[in-house]
Amino acid sequence: MKDLLDIMRKKTDSDGHAPVEFDRIRIGLASPEMIKSWSHGEVKKPETINYRTFKPERDGLFCAKIFGPVKDYECLCGKYKRMKYKGVICEKCGVEVTTAKVRRERMGHIELASPVAHIWFLKSLPSRIGLLLDMTLRDIERVLYFESYVVTDPGMTPFEKYQLLNDEEYFTALEEHGDEFVAKMGAEAVQDLLKDIDLEAEISRLREEIPQTTSETKLKKASKRLKLMEAFKDSNNKPEWMVMNVLPVLPPDLRPLVPLEGGRFATSDLNDLYRRVINRNNRLKRLLDLAAPDIIVRNEKRMLQESVDALLDNGRRGRAITGSNKRPLKSLADMIKGKQGRFRQNLLGKRVDYSGRSVITVGPTLRLHQCGLPKKMALELFKPFIFAKLQASGQATTIKAAKKMVERETPEVWDVLASVIRQHPVMLNRAPTLHRLGLQAFEPILIEGKAIRLHPLVCAAFNADFDGDQMAVHVPLTLEAQLEARALMMSTNNILSPANGEPIIVPSQDVVLGLYYITRDAVNAKGEGMVFADTHEVNRALATGQVAIHARVKVRVHQTVINENGEREQQTIIVDTTPGRCLLWEVVPEGLSFDMINLEMTKKNISKLINSCYRKLGLKDTVIFADQLMYLGFRQATRSGVSVGMEDMLIPPTKHTIIDKAETEVREIEQQFEQGFVTAGERYNKVVDIWARTNDQVAKAMMDNLSYTLVKNKQGEDEKQKSFNSIYMMSDSGARGSAAQIRQLAGMRGLMAKPDGSIIETPIKANFREGLTVLQYFISTHGARKGLADTALKTANSGYLTRRLVDVAQDLVITEPDCGTSGGLVMTPFIQGGDVIEPLRDRVLGRVTAEDVRRASDDEVVLPRGTLIDEKIAAQLEEAGVDEVKVRSVIACESTFGVCAKCYGRDLARGHLVNPGESVGVMAAQSIGEPGTQLTMRTFHVGGAASRTSAANSVQVRNKGTVRFHNVKTVQHAKGHLVSVSRSGEIGIADELGRERERYKLPYGASILLKDGELVEAGGIVATWDPHTHPLVTEVAGKARFSQIADGVTATSKTDDATGMTTVEILPVTARPASGKDLRPAIVLDTTDGGEQFYFLPQNTIVTVRDGETIGVGDVIGRVPQESSRTRDITGGLPRVADLFEARKPKEHAILAEVSGIVSFGKETKGKNRLVITPDDGSEIYEELIPKWRQINVFEGEHVNRGETISDGPQNPHDILRLKGEVALTNYIVNEVQDVYRLQGVKINDKHIEVIVRQMLRKVDIIDGGDTSFIKGEQVDYIRVVQENQAVLAQNKFPAKFERQLMGITKASLSTDSFISAASFQETTRVLTEAAVTGKEDDLRGLKENVVVGRLIPAGTGLAYHLERRRQEAEAAEHALHNDFSEVDQAFSQALNSEQF
């Protein structure tokens, strides 16, 4: 390993040597010798520069003798000047004659008069010095800051090593024992103790000790110490180097002193901190020379320690040292951490030359790959190219002349500019760049004016609009950069969105409106019923006004269709269409059929059209087509004359009657409230309900009124036709506006919310057309302001989420074609509440099959494994009736670094199998983060009013089909129907092909009316249940007998006034008298065969049978009312996504069964129930204490499976991973994240979420090391463990046992192998301290590390460079081996020859 400083020096060799290539960077502790080897001399004085001459003081902090000359090739006293004396050292002032920039790299040093502990290794938790010495941080600090003595060598005295003595104890001991023992204080003492540690002996002692340790805390501490000691042993770091004897001094140009006008100076804080250290150090030296009293020396040493602490990390210990203006000084640690630190400000984000920015305006005449660049800007950006061209063509003799010409802007300069710009792409960027489409390349077209012109179709990708947005322009300089910009970043190559694989170059707003307008049809328009020979004839008729653009006519069209085999066929057909659609047909490329455009072109339809064009005809045709669509749309929107007027907002005539009716209902409820029939809460809920319903009714009336008009047709009868109302057309086409907005314009504004989120019960009955009263306006202002405040918060939070995601996934790159695994995820259609939300074809599209796909009906192989599923195959799968496919997934990928192409599948932005080197991690992070700002920030309070949907109480099917049970356990009731006794059962409905169309959850105790495999008609009811109670269902028949159910002790009888029926209700434990506290009420069934079955009754159970009654199988013997679910906050939107990715444990999460077995309840403790599970396999009994207020869903004697829910609540992802495995966890996280995005209508491919989950599952906890090198309790990379276990198994030894760990994204980012990446993310100090102590090597495998060290990244086109480096490295290693052997051979033969036998 070379020293980093040598590398830096090599880079700056003026002889033009190539920079040193390196493959890894190691960080470690610097020994005093090493610090001196870097140094060019000792800084002895605190002076900086002479304030009159501005020359640096000798031996001071800016000394030219140590750090180098201030001016290029000129010594300080001026004896030697110019290049010819290069390398001469002036005998007068001692300065070497060289370039001044060595002052940026030459370091100095300070010889400390007393050792000083490095604050990072002392105070950065856990304290490394403390761990090594096995002392507490407080004790060490007392020694370091001269409060106590520590025994470093006890000799023959009763003291122990590491024992602390205060002054009195020390002097008493001195009197008693004299110099038989040694005790010291300060950093010297700590340094001696560290020197004395025998790492080898300690390590072997700890290795023996760990297996015998019983206490958990001791074990943790011992294994931590062991890890640290081994790290020291392996890394060639010595523990005593954590205490410094020599302090390095930063090169002066990195802590500059700049003279300001008025004789003052601006200086870096570091100079103040160094001055403080030097002053105290010099004073200490003087005191030691004078043999000053101990107490004074001690104080000086303590002050020296404190000043070095402040220099390294100001404010970590005690109060931060402040400058003259009461602001804490910026120390070395502050220089590198945080957003303004070295990492994030200068290494990961740099400013670039050859860039400019300006306002953007719309460029409707541009082609998709073009942008308009103002001439002024282009002239400045392309200057070097222009200079070179002017010189080459002989128009200017020198660069200076060329410069003059450009400044004068002579005519020939413009000609040169035009030729330079031809075919030279520029990159446009709009901040915030949330995904890779925020930076795209275009060909510049020179324009007058000062604004950049942007093609309207790329606005969606940039999220740009023309209300004053600015964009930046960057010029790719090298040929390679130009090539990449053209081949990869050109806007024409980015038609599909990387997030979901759908077109992102889709017309919006005016274009959509124009296309929609010309493809509408109208009843009885001019020329209806005409027949045309071809589209040209239609054009002529339109131009001469013979036919209206919306008329219904017949036209003969020629179309080219691509058949099954990919061949093109010509067809001629006669179609019913309109002249407007014929206009559109003229721009549609060959290969698309006419019926794709023979309909109203809403935004959705246009998107579909572009998508199928891309899939069928490829990139080039799509780009041309998109441009043509845009030109046509703009032109026709202009000609349509669609505008917005007051008259367009039609208020429905029935509005007032609907509102009057609602007001009457509200009055009735008010009366009921006054008479005491309903409570205040109920009244409020009902009123809010009524108004919400009324608002919907008004909106419906308004939309009906707005969307249809009555017209006379040719026969003179009235016919309904879609309205040509401007506002309605805008909304219907998807150009602008939504039903909700039109409702506010022409319906009623409806209910408003108060600042705390509660709804104000009096709605705004007016709409914007009628106008609002002052009060109504005032009520509505709150929502508007909250919206603005929310947006600001949301942007920050969303950005932070994206940053964490990028950081955790940045090193995931496609590294190999196929890892060969057969693991993966089983994909089924995503069904929720009976609706197919995402069909199977959408979920498997672009994935690779993990095993053969077989048809459900005859088990025939439809698709072999390893096939990439495209649109065609997905359609075939659907036809074959396949309803689950096992596909490869990044979760199961077995590549060591990165993932393989087969596990990832299709590259969504390109539409084919992903290329090696594609940076899929960053793509995933951007795809999830980019829509973040569209998500809501609020947490919803779900209370009475908001949970408007009535609880489901039956399964009613929508489609005819066959009933399928999914893990449903049932018992047969006497009346003939089945009763469900399983908790996680589901019912599916399959169509005639065997594809599942619907799926419903089936609660415990539901009555099932059909059997598995029976047919059901559409609308048939399959199962019913009571949504408000939990039934207790008997699984055997017998006679009921009450046990420990005593009135007034454990139960209470209630008689219903209305019905006169008496019911027995079990009392809660808290409400029972003392005698009933320990009783466990139960119903015992004496079965017919003489056995007994106990049913223990939870608190609040309503018993529905009488003592001695005969009971059949499946009867309900008791009901537990479900607490009207407590108002609980549902976290929605962005915070929910963040919670999922941070793997946070939810409050009051669901309790799952840890093992499979029979449930029973043990002895209760105060406030908690004891749940006992007796496992099926006879292993040890599992017990858990559950708080009494938790509702427990299982009953005594019931059988549960591992991972089944015992008590409801939000799921805890860690439990899912532990009990159900990583596939179940992946499905849970993917579905939960998708729920949030779906609610906002954002489409993200599952793949992206899986990529992040893979990174969250990187680490495992070692439970038992076996014969591997891992220690129990250690955290290791999953892939590493798997590989080491395979190696160990091959030798027939014991592999390590481990448990997968789920880490939140922040923690996962920090636990990455690369310390550079972790340090530049968060907690810089902690990461660097840990890395330095353990002597970590960074292999520079991720993207971030390589950006920081300034190399090409190992992704995309940079991957080739890295693979080549790796290959060379492997070859060099092999070569070295051969060399060693040949040398040994030579030596051996020489020895043989020299011996005289």
Curated annotation (Swiss-Prot):
**Which GO BP terms apply?**
DNA-templated transcription
Q: Which residues bind Mg(2+)?
A: 465, 467, 469
Give the note describing cofactor binding and stoichiometry: Binds 1 Mg(2+) ion per subunit.
Listed GO MF terms: DNA binding; DNA-directed RNA polymerase activity; magnesium ion binding; zinc ion binding
* Keywords, sorted A to Z: DNA-directed RNA polymerase, Magnesium, Metal-binding, Nucleotidyltransferase, Transcription, Transferase, Zinc
Enzyme Commission no = 2.7.7.6
Report one GO cellular component: DNA-directed RNA polymerase complex
Q: Which residues are recorded as binding Zn(2+) 2?
A: 819, 893, 900, 903
Q: What does the entry list as the binding residues for Zn(2+) 1?
A: 75, 77, 90, 93
- Which cofactor is essential here? Mg(2+); Zn(2+)
Q: Which reaction does it catalyse?
A: RNA(n) + a ribonucleoside 5'-triphosphate = RNA(n+1) + diphosphate
Does the entry feature the keyword Transferase, yes or no? Answer: yes
Assembly mode: The RNAP catalytic core consists of 2 alpha, 1 beta, 1 beta' and 1 omega subunit. When a sigma factor is associated with the core the holoenzyme is formed, which can initiate transcription.
| NCBIfam families xref list | rpoC_TIGR
The similarity comment for this entry is: Belongs to the RNA polymerase beta' chain family.
Q: In UniProt terms, what function does this protein have? A: DNA-dependent RNA polymerase catalyzes the transcription of DNA into RNA using the four ribonucleoside triphosphates as substrates.
Please identify the protein, giving its name as recorded.
DNA-directed RNA polymerase subunit beta'
